[in-house]
Amino acid sequence: MESFAGSCEIVEEKDAVRLAKHSSRYCMSPLGSSKDMEQRPALKSGYQGSMEYDIDQLFQSITIKPSPRRVMGSSFHHLETSASAGTSRSTSPSNKGAMKKPFPMGTPRSPRVGPSDSISLKQALRDLCISKASEMASQKRLSKSAAASPRVSEADRIKTLYRQVLNESAGKPGLPVDKGKSLVEISLTPVVDIPSSSQSVPQRYDVLETEPSNFISEPSQAEILLHVLGNGSGIKTVGYGMLETVSLCKSNKSGSCLSSGSGDYEIEIDENHTSPPHMVIEDQLVEIDKHVTSLPSCSGSKVDTEELDKSIVSSARVKSEPTALSSGLKGKLDNFPGSGTEKSKLVSKVTRNIPRPKPRPKKKILLKKKLKIVVNSATKMVEEVDTSLEPSASQLLCQKCHCAVKSTSTENHPPSNTSHTTDKNVSIEADQESLASPRLIRIVKCNKEASKGSSDSCEVSDSGEAVIVMKQEVSPSNYSGKGDADEQIRANPTSSEKFDFSLSSKNSLGDYSSSTSMSEESNLSRFSCGNKPHMSMDVRWEAVKHVKLQYGSLGLRHFNLLKKLGCGDIGTVYLAELVGTNCLFAIKVMDNEFLARRKKTPRAQAERAILKMLDHPFLPTLYAQFTSDNLSCLVMEYCPGGDLHVLRQKQLSRCFSEPATRFYVAEILLALEYLHMLGVIYRDLKPENILVREDGHIMLTDFDLSLRCAVNPTLLRSTSPPEKDPARMSGPYSTSNCIQPLCIEPSCRVPCFSPRLLSTQARNQKPRKPKRPDLLTQQFRSLPQLVAEPTEARSNSFVGTHEYLAPEIIKGEGHGAAVDWWTFGVLLYELLYGKTPFKGYDNEETLSNVVYQNLKFPDSPLVSFQAKELIRRLLVKDPESRLGSEKGAAEIKRHPFFEGLNWALIRCAIPPELPDIYDNGATEATSPEGNNRYLECKAIGDHLEFELF
């Protein structure tokens, strides 16, 4: 077969056997063991007048017990390469029988590692014949080849590959003894002469093994596992009835690949195919015709995927004969190494020529490659990725968008300005269906690289277990009302930008200008893009962004004001429709001059700052804010269900049932917990400020009286055991004198004075012992608890509604976050009983009752003891003894009143009732006959009024 430059061939030689008989030196391959030798089938002589006949005559003098087993299927060929070439193998007695030492499938091992036994004559003769015949045949072939010189460099690469494999495989375990039966092991000895000009790293081939299988009952399968260790390559073939050989040669020239130690590659090629059913097994003879080509090395130039697909050429042919298994196993392979000064290529062949079966369909090759990327410094993200098996060394494809991943090496890009804390190893696993379509699957750990630009790229998110995410990079420039940069900022609602707010102010409402130092439009756009995950896919977001993109900015002229929803202390709320859409919004309009005269501008600024930082399902969403004609407008979410005060008035008894009350106050409790974690004390909790969404869930609104303060999260360890938890000690029958006939809680036990009506079977049964608390539950309750409660906040402001004011606010002693738990108790009382607990004839009497009057519960309606106990512990006049003052909402959620409530899935709970969706008058206001009647806003006295015109 003709050779060509840049490739390595394995061809058949017809005269190899005849040339080997002139050999005069004998050596032995130290493979296998004498114990396994006895279990192999005897080799029968077959070639009279040839070198094989002489060898078989010598073999007959050696007693070999034939194996009674009759093996079906193809034999297991073990092909091993040695680092020594041109010299005979050691015939030390310590290596006796090493040729038949079984090796594990997929685990290479050095042939020199094995038990110390004596060498047999048969092994010495076999090694002699193979080495001398290979040497002479190689010399003859090279003398006839005129184009031998172009193949020198390729042969050197293969030879150096062998040496590295042998060096690295010395410490690997071997094959179990029972797997070593019926093995035919063939040794290849390449030349060891390496020219000084060669720059390739020592490389090796792994062991080629073929294990016999049940060839009749099971389909033939071939699995090829290529190990590329370091910068070398190797071959390991594991097959059942079929063999597939792929040779991978890599050049390690300077600049073509990464530096040494860049990573390990493991490529698995799985092929499933079925042999034709008409094939009849005659003998376990396999002929392998291997066409070995070298893959192009990793270089700066791009390599076409078609060339890479053509670079791996593999073929396997399995021959079979009628079942004459008693003859045993026979296979030969000759290797022809050159002399010490000559350069030759590896030649592997089998001497039998058997008719070939029908060609099989082309098999699908699956490659699995493992790469390693090392972060070498704090200014570099990763080093170059060695992608010699991919279409291009500097380009990868993303799995989702199939876009190119830009190279992160320092040669093509300047160092990033983002500093990284530590240097980490980055491991990338790529699963490829073919060489032409590499796909990135997972990046285990990496540091985040903040790069500038507006192009789409694949970056890595900064997390403990990072994954590849598609991210559209946005320009850091502020929103200017026009340009592509603004469009990109608005079009990316899940941006990874982070925003910090100063929470250092404790008692001032106007000290938040530092958090809004940027323009209000820009600051809002950043929040609307990055901090609205639960509302990012809302249609109203898309409508607002579309109007901003179309007109450059958003103003009051883009809304149709439909009707007035309510009037507050600093502004009026209107129902509005965005022009050209069917989206309804609630717009809070505030007159800046009016606020300045009343000195309420800090309250408006505080509310705007709080709304920007909120992102909670039970808190309002701020879609936009703008100033138009001296009017400050806040575009918020519209709740068609009205407020909780109106909804309570619609009930038959003017109050909610206990399950409905538990539903509403649980969501309010979560909203207050979120606000306290942000350092916001609400201070104005009442039913009028609790709106009902269209899905029946609540939304807390109106933050103009809220106080922003510092919050220090702390870990508190539980000091009392779970069975003595103060939040759970309260119960109708927690004491021995348990008489509470009005308790209607189903979970309560029967009162002591009630008659016991038990059946006969129940009387005979032994009383069950109370279940001990679960160990896991005890451990969970004993774990440290995170508390983010602004316990140190203090304010002397007299704010709030009279009926909901806490005693400490009325006394002027200063108040903190505990005022929210007082108002929470008043709200719970009002929802259950339909009125507040301390209401008087006028405001003065109301304030007096709050400070001096004791808490009383009316006789009707009937309320459970748990609800009363919770109200009693919340309405403690001493703020330090009030429930929630120490641990906040976490302490209240553990109360028996909320027992059985799934706090994590409360959004999935069915609300008590859904609001009535009524016509808001949008059709009349926007009809052509009405000429798009708008509402005019103007300040009259102390109120804001909108008039039709």
UniProtKB/Swiss-Prot annotation:
The gene is KIPK2. Serine/threonine-protein kinase that could be involved in the negative regulation of root growth. It comes from Arabidopsis thaliana (Mouse-ear cress). It comes from the Eukaryota. One of its GO terms (molecular function) is kinase activity. This is Serine/threonine-protein kinase KIPK2. Belongs to the protein kinase superfamily. Ser/Thr protein kinase family. Interacts with KCBP, PERK8, PERK9, PERK10 and PERK13. Residues 407-420, 495-512 have a biased composition (Polar residues). PROSITE patterns: PROTEIN_KINASE_DOM, PROTEIN_KINASE_ST. Residues 559-898 form the Protein kinase domain. The active site is at residue 684. ATP binds at residues 565-573, 588. Residues 79-116, 323-344, 407-426, 495-525 are annotated as: Disordered. InterPro entries: Kinase-like_dom_sf, Prot_kinase_dom, Ser/Thr_kinase_AS.
